[in-house]
Amino acid sequence: MLFRSTFDRLGIPEAEQTSLGGVGAQYDSEVVYHSIQEDMVKQGVIYTDMETAIREHEDIVKEYFMKLVPPKDHKFAALHGAVWSGGSFVYVPAGVQVKMPLQSYFRLNAAGAGQFEHTLDRKSTV
């Protein structure tokens, strides 16, 4: 698998064991790898792909996704809201501090493709 050899070359398996709280990888919006440390899950941290977040955490996604910058506010926000695909979903409950980084890797092969991030909840840090 292309991603596995890239992960190995970048030293991700070792970093995941020693210094990352979670790792995700997507190839053209398809999830090829995802993990999160159990202690973060116990604190209520959610780190998954967008499709899983919509299925398993619909209430949180509906509450926040596309709310800070609504699609009607700007043409690029509207475009993003209309055609988004893939992506990582990170939710850190209010007051929780994530001490170890969460790392997402994306490989986009389509020319002109882009990615857009959204940050959720007050007084949370990653």
Spell out what each predicted region is.
Residues 1-126:
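Glycine-rich and polybasic anion-binding loops at the starts of cofactor/ligand-binding domains
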